[in-house]
């Protein structure tokens, strides 16, 4: 069986879940080809990029120059190159293909692809990729069934939904299978009009062979708190910093490390300075994986207080939480998006309402008083939950079976 992966941009260092799924299908013995519209950063990649020689398996459909005018010239040239083909003309149907017809993306691809890309099934990551894949199949550029994975921003951001809701409704008719990563997103797809029989929840997961549980340890003094996340609004790190201000006022001894980079870095650093928390809150920025692991080993609790962004952007189910639970680090998070599908409140971790710094500070203060006897059953249930419901190897085998039955 041949499996194609259809991506808007590849590779992206932030999308390790895509890379992991691609290599898993290769490891399972499937023939794998990758189609991407745009080329990502091929210099700063994960080891699997080289190990599996993924460049040789990838075809980029929009290898374009930079700059708006240069892009349009290039697309016009590619369109003219294939103007003798029927599908190139069809791709210019504005009523049927919308913005991707107007900006010549589809016609340029049709103009340069003489022989269709074939696979038994194409897995499209993120809703917009599924939309484009379905259009290209209709135009004869790709041949095969299409399964679209919906993650988070593609099904929650108001900007995305304002543009793509009509496109998604077309995808529900044109596509073969919708794969939301949570029950919450499955319900949302149904409300948008997707037939229930075209929906199957397929979670992201973690490779349990990479995570050995550490011994249960009581919280230290000072309490070691850690977050590993991209620095964006929906990660709720501004709420965490406000909670730290309250903890400090209450006299709770702690140290908080925020690992990661992102567009909210300056805002978070300003908040730390404003609250005079430089002595207890650190932002080391990007760290290589071995240093992150060492810091995680030192941590007493993993904190991810996710919130809904001002633009509606939401998490799916954060893999960072799964990894912490798999290795035996207690987690504190929020009642946000699909997180309660992973963390059972007060049983496999602790959840507080979104945007509630006071509740977060209270939870962390209470956590600092727990002993190993109280923590042991929570940590055990957390790993069992990930092992049972978020085990990457099991999930990928189940997905492969589902696709083979399409």
Curated annotation (Swiss-Prot):
Family, similarity comment = Belongs to the glycosyltransferase group 1 family. Glycosyltransferase 4 subfamily.
Record GO biological process: colanic acid metabolic process; lipopolysaccharide biosynthetic process; slime layer polysaccharide biosynthetic process
Q: List the protein's name.
A: Putative colanic acid biosynthesis glycosyltransferase WcaL
Q: Does the keyword Electron transport apply?
A: no
User: Annotated pathway, please?
Assistant: Slime biogenesis; slime polysaccharide biosynthesis
Any Pfam family matching the protein = Glycos_transf_1
Q: Write down the superkingdom of origin.
A: Bacteria
EC numbers on record: 2.4.-.-
Q: Which UniProt keywords apply?
A: Glycosyltransferase, Lipopolysaccharide biosynthesis, Transferase
Q: Which GO terms describe its molecular function?
A: glycosyltransferase activity
Keyword Nucleus present in the record's keywords: the answer is no
